[in-house]
Regions:
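Primary mode marks residue(s) on the alpha4-beta5-alpha5 output face of response regulator receiver
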Residues: 1-192
Length: 192
């Protein structure tokens, strides 16, 4: 697995991507082209911190970058074009209008949300992104790949603890490959 920073045309950070080699047995065909996109023999999943429409056109000025920092929003690319992105609510109160399913609150991380998880779902449909809210505010997101990736960047939560951050836990998770997770915090002070 590779983690890749994405920069706009002005050279300011604009997002982050994870890439899985095509030789891996992951992702499922259901996840190819949304949210994973094939490029250079890797399946990429990308998240943007600014409106994807400006990344390759105008980017952000030095003044905007100084004022806004790393970004203003969180967009999950969900198709072959960055414009096919889902904007994530800043406030947890905006989540009920979406398909994100409330998981559990994990100490020092926050409340986990998983996309459209169901107890009886197929793991081929398991969307590999989760959101974290702390104090009602989006404070992190992460990737959860159903593949035992070997990287110092990822964690491998034992199946015995998955119910501590996911609710419901899809039955298929217990039969699927181990999860490889990576958390990306959007705050200067994650409570770790």
């Amino acid at each position: 697995m590779a983690v890749i920073l994405i920069y706009d045309v002005q050279g300011h950070i604009a997002g982050i991507s994870a890439a899985v080699p095509t030789t891996a047995a992951y992702p499922s065909s259901f996840l190819k082209n949304h949210p994973f996109v094939m490029y250079n023999n890797m399946h990429h999943i990308s998240v943007f911190f600014v409106d994807p429409a400006i990344i390759c056109s105008t980017g952000r000025s030095n003044g905007q970058y100084t004022q806004q920092g790393v970004g203003t929003d969180l967009y999950l690319q969900n198709g072959t074009n960055p414009s096919d992105s889902i904007k994530i609510p800043h406030k947890e109160s905006g989540i009920p209008a979406t398909h994100w399913t409330r998981g559990r609150c994990f100490p020092s991380m926050g409340v986990h949300y998983w996309f459209n998880t169901r107890k009886d779902m197929s793991c081929d449909e398991f969307y590999p992104v989760f959101l974290l809210y702390n104090g009602g505010q989006l404070n992190a997101f992460g990737w959860a790949f159903q593949s035992p990736m070997t990287s110092t960047r990822v964690e491998h939560p034992p199946k015995s603890v998955i119910s501590a951050f996911m609710n419901p836990v899809p039955d298929c998770i217990y039969q699927a490959a181990d999860l490889s997770t990576l958390h990306i915090y959007l705050t200067n002070n994650p409570a770790l």
